């Protein structure tokens, strides 16, 4: 069952990719969708067997590397963390496959698209189930390449080319540091197997653990789009909308958070790594929320909300609340996939326009889409008893419940980030569905709900966004739960804060995020409805324009990167090419050799004068050279006689030819 779970998406991908012309579009849909749906059902069985019944499974398939210094197995590990990650990955992936049947129905390259989707799912399964860092790295690189292929799916568009290369190169920075971290583990521990490294970690110097942990954090920063290496995430919106849902909800962006959670028995022994995670997540949360508030593209706003929620998960890791971070990851996958697929339904119905300032008044035309996006937005802003409420608020309470200065400051920073999340969620809903129509007539003339394939995934995800958090909170974060008794998540006894979070945090600080959520939602809609001129006048003032430009241009970080990093690297590369590749290498290599041989042949050619006395002089000089050689180096006289005889024969032949 477990190997079938891993292999099925790969078989679907190969069938659709290599035999797409034989099986046709419908055959590709049937094979890939049925493969992923069957894999999802097997993952649910694995969740019950491994997670609920606490029966972890390890499967050794074959030996990969068998060297004296390194032994690596094709080994797959199914524990509570693995099966918890498989649930959102495969449920969202299967629903995205179904959704794409309708969304991509007019695209001529359906087989290629579904092949990429299934391959993406397979690589994520490899990443999650691998039993050592090298196998995990195979999946890690695989999802990176698949994201490049999917973002660049419409490869005739320049924007798609640029975005995919940006995603690939930004992730290469993180991959480089992750590789260094894996080599450091190999050098320190002599192996890269999870069990061996985690069992030895308590006995190693904290500085070594810190160095390895920082490399892992930088790798996770790129993949999970934290501040500094975040620029690829909004640009990835150039891909088709189902791709955005798959990348930003369930697969690629969660890989970095998974890496840190899987490495919890390692990074728990380095307080430096934990404090870096704490502050990195806090800065990312408020940073991305501020940018998202000033974006006008519906998909980019949702992308920045993803970045903000990933910051929340990294805060949970920095607090050693790995189970809460995992719970938030699973919850977030459902309502974020719903937001993206809902946005895709809106874009699909209004002639592929993504600027939500040109929407407005779509609620009567798209009642189902409005309902599901309202549910997803309520879950995103953590309205009580929605799925997002049970994990997001608990992360904030854990930050305060740590009772350190850093934790308290992070609590207030993350609360501010949650406030801005509320504002842009209300903004998207209001400007898309509730305000007066702002778009051209054609947008509304042909606006319509999608077919069954578009609507079924929306309804299923809406149900998950309402009920999943309540139904599973005791499994993931209950005080007496035995779900993680297999030690897949390790919390050092000194870092255990769940009891303090539950019982010691004052009620005021538990209710503060909820108070801000409700009050800001109401205030933003009231301002927009009753005093729009006040907002418009402020925006057109010098101060308002400067503030809007600063945040709309994403703190000018990309401008700084281009000016001070990219330009310098390109200049250095140009100079290197000019001086080495096109300079000394070619001068000493092909061009230099050719020029030298031509000069040598011309020089030899000049010796052929056609005058007999000149040739006699050459013979005399040669004879003197060989005699002196014999004298100085003691050569055999027979050899000299042979040489002289040969010279006379050659000379005689030349004279006869003339």
Curated annotation (Swiss-Prot):
This is NADH-ubiquinone oxidoreductase chain 5. It holds the Pfam family Proton_antipo_N. Its main location: mitochondrion. GO terms for biological process: ATP synthesis coupled electron transport; electron transport coupled proton transport. NCBIfam families: NDH_I_L, PRK06590.1. Core subunit of the mitochondrial membrane respiratory chain NADH dehydrogenase (Complex I) that is believed to belong to the minimal assembly required for catalysis. Complex I functions in the transfer of electrons from NADH to the respiratory chain. The immediate electron acceptor for the enzyme is believed to be ubiquinone. The keyword Nucleus does not apply. It is an enzyme of class 7 (translocase). The lineage of its organism: Eukaryota, Fungi, Dikarya, Ascomycota, Pezizomycotina. It is found in: Mitochondrion inner membrane. One of its GO terms (cellular component) is mitochondrial inner membrane. Its EC number is 7.1.1.2. Belongs to the complex I subunit 5 family. GO terms for molecular function: NADH dehydrogenase (ubiquinone) activity.
């Amino acid at each position: 069952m477990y190997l079938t779970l891993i292999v099925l998406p790969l078989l679907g991908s190969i069938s659709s990719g290599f035999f797409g012309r034989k099986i046709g579009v419908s055959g590709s849909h049937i094979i890939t969708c049925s493969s992923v749906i069957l894999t999802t059902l097997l993952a649910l069985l694995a969740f019950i067997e491994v997670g609920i019944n606490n029966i972890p499974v390890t499967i050794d398939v074959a030996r990969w590397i068998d060297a004296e210094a390194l032994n690596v197995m094709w080994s797959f590990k199914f524990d509570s963390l693995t099966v918890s990650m498989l649930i959102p990955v495969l449920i969202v992936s299967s629903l995205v496959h179904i959704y794409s049947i309708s969304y991509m129905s007019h695209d001529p390259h359906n087989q290629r698209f579904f092949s990429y989707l299934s391959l993406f799912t397979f690589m994520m399964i490899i990443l999650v189930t691998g039993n050592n860092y090298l196998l995990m790295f195979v999946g890690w690189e695989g999802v990176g390449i698949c994201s490049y292929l999917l973002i660049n799916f419409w490869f005739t568009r320049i924007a798609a080319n640029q975005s995919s290369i940006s995603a690939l190169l930004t992730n290469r920075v993180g991959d480089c540091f992750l590789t260094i971290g894996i080599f450091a583990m190999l050098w320190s521990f002599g192996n890269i197997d999870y069990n061996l490294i985690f069992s030895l970690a308590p006995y190693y110097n904290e500085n070594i653990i810190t160095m390895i942990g920082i490399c892992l954090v930088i790798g996770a920063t790129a993949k999970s789009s934290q501040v500094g290496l975040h620029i690829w995430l909004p640009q990835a919106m150039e891909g088709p909308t189902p791709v955005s849902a798959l990348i930003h909800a369930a697969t690629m962006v969660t890989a970095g958070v998974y890496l840190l959670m899987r490495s919890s028995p390692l990074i728990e022994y380095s307080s430096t790594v934990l404090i870096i995670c704490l502050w990195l997540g806090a800065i990312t949360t408020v940073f991305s929320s501020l940018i998202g508030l000033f974006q006008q593209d519906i998909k980019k706003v949702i992308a920045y909300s993803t970045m903000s929620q990933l910051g929340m998960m990294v805060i949970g890791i920095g607090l050693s609340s790995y189970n809460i971070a995992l719970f938030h990851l699973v919850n977030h996958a459902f309502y974020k996939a719903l937001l993206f697929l809902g946005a895709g339904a809106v874009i699909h119905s209004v002639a592929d326009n993504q600027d939500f300032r040109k929407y407005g008044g779509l609620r009567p035309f798209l009642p189902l889409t409005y309902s599901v996006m309202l549910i997803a937005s309520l879950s995103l802003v953590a309205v009580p008893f929605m799925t997002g409420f049970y994990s997001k608020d608990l992360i904030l309470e854990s930050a305060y419940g740590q009772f350190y200065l850093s934790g308290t400051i992070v609590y207030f920073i993350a609360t501010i980030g949650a406030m801005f999340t509320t504002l842009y969620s209300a903004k998207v809903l209001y400007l898309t569905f509730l305000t007066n129509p702002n778009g051209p007539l054609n947008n509304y003339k042909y606006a319509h709900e999608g077919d069954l394939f578009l609507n079924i995934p929306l309804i299923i995800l809406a149900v998950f966004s309402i009920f999943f958090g309540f139904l599973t909170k005791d499994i993931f974060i209950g005080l007496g739960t035995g779900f993680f008794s297999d030690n897949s998540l390790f919390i050092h006894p000194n870092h255990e804060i769940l009891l303090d979070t539950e019982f010691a945090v004052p009620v005021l600080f538990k209710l503060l995020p909820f108070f801000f959520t409700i009050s800001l939602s109401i205030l933003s809609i009231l301002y927009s409805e009753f005093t729009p001129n006040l907002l418009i006048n402020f925006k057109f003032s010098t101060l308002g324009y400067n503030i809007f430009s600063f945040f709309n241009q994403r703190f000018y970080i990309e401008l700084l990167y281009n000016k001070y990093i990219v330009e310098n690297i390109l200049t250095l590369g140009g100079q290197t090419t000019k001086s080495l590749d096109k300079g000394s290498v070619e001068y000493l290599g092909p061009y230099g050799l050719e020029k030298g041989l031509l000069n040598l042949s011309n020089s030899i050619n000049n010796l052929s004068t056609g005058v007999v006395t000149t040739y006699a002089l050459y013979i005399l000089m040669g004879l003197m050279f060989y005699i002196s050689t014999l004298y100085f180096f003691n050569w055999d006289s027979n050899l000299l006689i042979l040489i002289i005889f040969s010279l006379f024969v050659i000379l005689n032949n030349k004279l006869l030819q003339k």
